[in-house]
Amino acid sequence: NYLVCECWTDQNTYAKYYESGVDSMFDFAFADKSGIIANVMNGKASATSYAKNLETEQGMYAQYNPDYINAPFYTNHDMGRSAGYYAGENSEAQTKMGNALNLLMNGNVFLYYGEELGMKGSGKDENKRAPMYWNKDGNAEGMCKGPADMDDFRMKFDSLEEQQEDPDSIYNYVKQVIRVRNQNPVIARGTTAYLEQYSGEQCFALTRSDEN
C-alpha cells in the first residue's frame, strides 16, 4: 500500500506529519502562484533558492521519517493553473520550465491534468476544474462540459489535438521531460546536492545521486 496525504499549510508544519509513518506528503512549498517554482520563474526569487530548498527539505522530512517519499506537485484543483502565473512574450517558455522544475524533483511527482497543455483556469473553483482541452471544437467527440458555474473563457495555448502535431509545443516538451525522468530513475530516488559554486541569481546546479 502507498499513502499520500494533503496538509495545505507551511512546510515546517506538514513535515511533522511524516512522523505518523505516512509515505508521502504533498510538497506545498513548491506549488501554487506564490510557491518556490513560480517565484523563481517570475524573478521574485533566485534560481539558487530552488536548488537550496531541494537540498534542505530532505533533512527536514527525513528527521521525522527516514523512509519518506516526497510528493511534489505544481498545481491542483484548488489552485489557479500555472499558465496564468506568467504573462508576456516569455510566458510559454516559463510555463514549460515551471513544469520541468516540478517534474525533475525527487519522489513521486504529481501533474494536474491540463498542465501539460498550459490550460488556463483561475478565480473561482469551477474555473480551476475546466474540462480537459482535447480539441478546440467544444462539441468534438470526447469533449466534456465544465462545472455548471464555470466562466466562459478562452484557453491561452492550443488544444491537445493541435499540440500533438507541434514538436515545440508545451505538450511535447512535457513528454520529453517525463521521458528523461523515466529513463533516469536516480532523478526520482536519488539524493540532491546543491552546487553553490555553479549557482547564482539566474541559474543553479545540483547533483542527484544514489548508492549506484
What is each PLM-predicted segment?
Residues N1-Q11, Y17:
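Acidic/aromatic-lined carbohydrate-recognition and catalytic surfaces
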Residues Y17-S20, M41-K44:
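Short, surface-exposed amphipathic charged segments that create phosphate/polyanion-binding patches used
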Residues G21-D23, D67, N127:
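Short, solvent-exposed loop/turn segments at the edges of secondary structure
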Residues Y2-L3, D67-I69, N106-F110:
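Loop/turn elements at helix/coil->beta-strand transitions in domains of secreted/extracellular proteins
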Residues Y14-Y17, S122-K124:
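A short acidic (Asp/Glu
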Residues N42-P66:
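Glycoside hydrolase catalytic-domain groove-lining segments
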Residues W8-T9, M25, A31, G35, ...:
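Loop/helix patches that line or flank the sugar-binding groove of alpha-linked glycan CAZymes
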